[in-house]
Amino acid sequence: LSTSSAASDVYKRQILLHQKIITHDEMMATVIEARNNAANNPNALLTDHVSEDLYQADSLISSPLRGFDCPPISDGASAMVIASEDKAFEFTDNPIWIEGIDHSIESSNLGSRDLTTSPTIQNAITNLNLKNINFDVAELHTQFSHEVPFLRKLLNLTNVPTNLSGGPLVGNVMMCAGLDAIGKTFQSLVSDQSDHGIAHASSGPCLQHNMVVHLERHK
């Protein structure tokens, strides 16, 4: 058995499907939505529309993972400038604030983990007091289609606009896609005049290593 990123995530996807935590239809909808949202992202690598018929006809990489369910391996770079409170107001009258960051890791041994949930995400919800926050936008570092409905349910984002950039399914810059998610959340708060945004970054097999960031516009 391969332990590559795609292969190991097949294990998680099979478990989530078997336990009825996610569905095939949710994954297909994720791919279609990502391609539609790619129109909002000038840096997206994949912008062609995907219909239900196209998705169903796509070849399997490793059942039940199709090509459309996987991210394009992308080259690029990201940078972020974080300023102190007094310095931020030298650049803008309306800075976006980092209200909280939670960053933790789970075991690299897949056999010792419960792949139907995520303790690091659950800890972030508690540590950042996210349960009672109504988020306006979310950007998740979800490299495979099954991760989107999984994380949206864990983070209570089912009705929150998510990955309006298309997310990693339309452009997945190696070692930068998580930082991109934070930057895209910032951009949404600036351009849409929204109040609360949540960003997520991850690395390791099956969402092993997770960072959750709460961004806020102060009124």
Predicted regions and their residues:
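Basic phosphate/pyrophosphate-binding loop/patch that engages nucleotide-derived ligands
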Residues: 18-23
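Polyanion-binding loop/helix "lid" in catalytic or ligand-binding cores
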Residues: 25, 29-33, 39-76
